[in-house]
Amino acid sequence: MKATKETLSPTRVKLTVEVPFDELKPSLDATYRKLARQVRVSGFRPGKVPPRILDQRLGRGVILDEAVQEALPQLYSEAVQAEEVDVLSRPEVDITEFADGGQLVFTAEVDVRPEVALPEFADLSVTVDAVEVTDEQVEEQLGALRDRFAQLQPVERAVQTGDFVSLDLSAQADGKPIEGAEATGLSYEVGSGNLIEGLDEAIVGAADGESRTFTTELLAGDQAGQQAEVTATVRGVKEKELPALDDDFATTASEFDTLDDLRGDVRSRLEQSRRTEQVGQAREKLLESLLERVDVPVPDSLLAGEIEAREHRLSHELENIGTDRATYLETLGQTAEEFDAEVRETAGKAIRSQFILDAVIDAESIGIDQGELMEQVIYRAQRSGLQPDVYAQQLAQGEGLQALMADVLRTKALFLLLENAKVVDGEGNPVELALPARPAPDADEDDDHAGHDHEGHDHADHAGHDHAGDDAAAEPAEAPAATAAVDSGDRDI
């Protein structure tokens, strides 16, 4: 077999493969054996029909065509390996020459991974926010902690914002009560705004036992979207009584004996949170910088697939929450054209980021050890409510395990870039990022640019497999037949 490669674009190549007829003999023999088992010919037992009889009954050309179809996947795979083609899509195969006894010539056009010219890592620089925790932020956290330990005390006064009230609710439309729109003894925090629009304004100032009626739009039920009159009756008013901010509170609310120690711990935790946010900010800005500096073409087929995957996930999520695309776009304040353009842009960035990080993985020979993989498996298994071994088996059945490994590898590549990049704060002071020693579980889960899809969707797997040996890549899609294909079922002739 002879294979030659022609570069059509930075992301697409054309393979021309020439195969002598003798090299097709194993596939031809296998086709005869298969047909001998399938075809029933009077006077011959199943599996014992001679090739010459099959030629007479089915036609030599039909049999040759089926043999070629059998041989194409392996021939294509060998050509991919020989030419070191890093395939990213199923090939478009065209048989250009074939005759009985003559050579087989076919072409295969396929999308490939583009070459990525990485910049010097030391030339990379990002600016992040400094880790600053103010006294006001510390006191805000202490206030939230006090709020958690607050006691509700009954009061004899009108309702105020921040009170907790017990409410009886009823509603009517067109003068008729709405079935199912009644509630008794409902506990509600006034001012939270999480119950009915207009309720807060209506009951502020009401006394215990007083009823207030207001008009609002129904958001659910058979009459959703209609105007209704809602009556709210106050059945009790309580206010929050906050504990004193002193050493006794520190002892009650924490493991510390003094308020100063508690305040110091709160500050320390806030600083740690800011450092974690700083790492996330550096990751995001570094990826943005790389996308601006590195030219990475994206195959059209890959971009279309990523957009389709994102649209599918969105449709599934909208269905789960009981809404549709039009309503969702209305909440975003976007037209369909604006939203589609945004999806296309983010999808392209996701793929380009993958290509860049994968190039770093290759350039630096980044690997993954068993411990890193198991940490991820255990964490995600717990999050899914499954035993780790069961979750691992589910991953292994599809492409999930390789996608998970690719996630970890790309995170390690990104951390390597951050370790070598110049990181400063807004005033130009050097910043030492608090990078973990190894990728934390789901460290990149919210990083859209990294292109991670935790349902196993991945564009280019760097979990150590050979792209040329990929089953999906090695099987030509809809290869044109030289003649009519032979049926694979049993036949009576």
From Swiss-Prot:
It comes from the Bacteria. Residues 162-243 form the PPIase FKBP-type domain. Involved in protein export. Acts as a chaperone by maintaining the newly synthesized protein in an open conformation. Functions as a peptidyl-prolyl cis-trans isomerase. Belongs to the FKBP-type PPIase family. Tig subfamily. Residues 474-485 have a biased composition (Low complexity). PANTHER family: TRIGGER FACTOR CHAPERONE AND PEPTIDYL-PROLYL CIS/TRANS ISOMERASE (PTHR30560), TRIGGER FACTOR-LIKE PROTEIN TIG, CHLOROPLASTIC (PTHR30560:SF3). It is an enzyme of class 5 (isomerase). GO terms for biological process: 'de novo' cotranslational protein folding; cell division; chaperone-mediated protein folding; protein transport; protein unfolding. This is Trigger factor. The gene is tig. It is found in: Cytoplasm. GO terms for molecular function: peptidyl-prolyl cis-trans isomerase activity; protein folding chaperone; ribosome binding. InterPro entries: PPIase_dom_sf, PPIase_FKBP_dom, Trig_fac, Trigger_fac_C, Trigger_fac_C_sf, Trigger_fac_ribosome-bd_bac, Trigger_fac_ribosome-bd_sf, Trigger_fact/SurA_dom_sf. Its EC number is 5.2.1.8.
